[in-house]
Structures are given as structure tokens and as C-alpha cells.
Amino acid sequence: YPKADKILEIGAGNLNHLKFEKNFKKYDVIEPKNYLLEIASLKNKKKVNNKYADIKLIPKNSKYDKIIAIAVIEHIENLELLFSEINLHLKKEGKLVIEIPAEGEFLWWLGWRMTTGIGFWLKYKLDYGVIMKYEHVNNAKIILNKIEKFFKIEKIKSFPLNIQHARLYIHIVCSKKHY
């Protein structure tokens, strides 16, 4: 992850990503589900400067060196609004780091189908795919296309292979477009 003084984490959950960030001066989070922040460790809670329930609640003059969204973007309905707000808060030379499941690609589908899909069916006799349509409202292709409209993609890394349809997870580093 690129190092940064001022960081904003979108969808911080229980603050489990904090251990990967070093030497920052300010760490703000967006988390609409307050109970997730409540179960975070006291050590991590002390490192957080500001907590917001929504990106629109961040003061317009707040700028960040790095904005991160780990396993969050696939859940957001209005990506255009989110990316517009991120652009507002990302410093000119700042970095946006996004990690998403490679949903919609073959290996992701196969892995999901053979693990969660079967497990859910065996336990509940229900198709988890129906639930996933409401949980993950965007697949990887949609997300990558929207990112390209708002940001310059500097790097894409994938796990386990850096090949489309042979990946489970995608790590994207972006910067602002300079016109």
C-alpha cells in the first residue's frame, strides 16, 4: 500500500485493516454500521481521528493522501456519487486503493459456487446466488469501468493469477485524472 500521512478508509468495519497502515498522522473512517466500530479493539479505536457514517458528512475541505476501500465497492449502489465524493477529498497527488472480488469472472464464480454456494444449499436448501444479487450490486467489470471514468488506474494486481478470469481478488491503485 502506498504510504500516506492522511488516510480515509471507506467501509472500515471493525478496523481490521489498520494493522496494514504504518506511520500515518491522521486516520479517518467511514462506517455506517456503528456496531462494527464498537467491536473494534480499543488499540485500533484510539488510532482513529474522525468517524463518519457517510462520505457526504466529511467536511468539504478535508483532503487525504490516500483513500482506501477494501471489499466495499461491490456493495455500493451509486458508484458515480461515491467516486465524485472521493475525487473531492483526494489530494492532487493522492492515491485511491480499492480491492474487490473478481465477481463475474470464471475463477471467482467457480470458487464461490464450489464453496459458499454448495454450503448454503446444503444447510438451508436455498440458492445463495439470489442473496448475492442484493449483497454485491456491482461485479468486477462494472466497477473497473466506472473507476476508469473517474480515475487514472496506475496498477492492477490480482490473486492468485494476474489474468482476467483466473483471479479471485483484484487490487487497484488509482490517482486523480489531471486534465
Language-model-detected regions and their locations in the chain:
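Conserved class I S-adenosyl-L-methionine
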Residues: 4-13
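Class I SAM-dependent methyltransferase SAM/SAH-binding core
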Residues: 13-56
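Short conserved loop adjoining the S-adenosyl-L-methionine
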Residues: 56-62
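A conserved beta-strand element that flanks and buttresses the S-adenosyl-L-methionine
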Residues: 68
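Hydrophobic adenine-recognition pocket in adenosine-nucleotide-binding enzymes
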Residues: 72
